[in-house]
């Protein structure tokens, strides 16, 4: 009678699993799911694929997130928090030019973040909407306070004007990250860094002219 024993590699993996803290397990699951989404889109949100990619059991995902929907909501919160951190950092310096701040905002949506937010919205339409709205509200509050502080005495800066500026920039940055290259090509423009910079400079000039008119 033969006795089958684990190889050292299998034993090591089991020990590592047992030693993984709940926070480490959640982080591993989220990172694996995020990686699968980046490579396959929403189709990557199959729990069995995530479990296989993370080297864990399907039941462990359910233990930490309750369901696929719970995992999607956690992924959405993670993406929203990442976007908020980047946008707040983009506005951290009040001395930065409009051009530099626009570059930072546009870059905040790059590296697949806009795609992740869009894809997650397709599988959980209510999961991230509120969080994203609150991000923009926070950014609008910061910008409005800055515009009021910079305005000459007696100038009135309507809050809805600031809200519209935030909406314009966020929509442009989000859309550019998703379809910017395709839209450039469809307009007969080269999908290059120079084209991106040209549009951002044009948008900065538009915002500056509008702000000068409002504050004057």
Predicted segments, located by residue:
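Short Lys/Arg-rich basic patches
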Residues: 15-19
């Amino acid at each position: 009678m033969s006795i089958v024993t684990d190889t050292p590699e299998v034993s090591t993996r089991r020990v590592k699993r047992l030693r993984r803290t709940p926070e480490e397990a959640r982080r591993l699951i989220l990172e694996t799911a995020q990686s699968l989404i980046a490579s396959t889109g929403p189709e990557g949100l199959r729990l069995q694929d995530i479990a296989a990619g993370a080297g864990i059991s399907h039941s462990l995902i359910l233990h930490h997130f309750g369901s696929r929907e719970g995992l999607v909501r956690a992924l959405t919160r993670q993406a929203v928090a990442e976007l908020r951190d980047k946008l707040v950092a983009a506005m951290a310096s009040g001395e930065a030019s409009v051009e530099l701040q626009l570059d930072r905002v546009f870059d905040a949506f790059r590296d697949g973040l806009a795609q992740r937010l869009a894809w997650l919205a397709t599988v959980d339409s209510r999961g991230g909407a509120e969080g994203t709205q609150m991000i923009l509200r926070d950014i609008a509050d910061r910008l409005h306070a800055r515009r009021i502080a910079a305005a000459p005495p007696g100038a009135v800066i309507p809050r809805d004007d600031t809200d519209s500026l935030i909406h314009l920039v966020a929509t442009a940055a989000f859309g550019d990250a998703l379809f910017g290259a395709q839209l450039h090509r469809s307009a007969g423009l080269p999908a290059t860094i120079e084209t991106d910079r040209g549009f951002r400079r044009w948008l900065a000039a538009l915002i500056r002219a509008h702000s000068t008119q409002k504050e004057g």
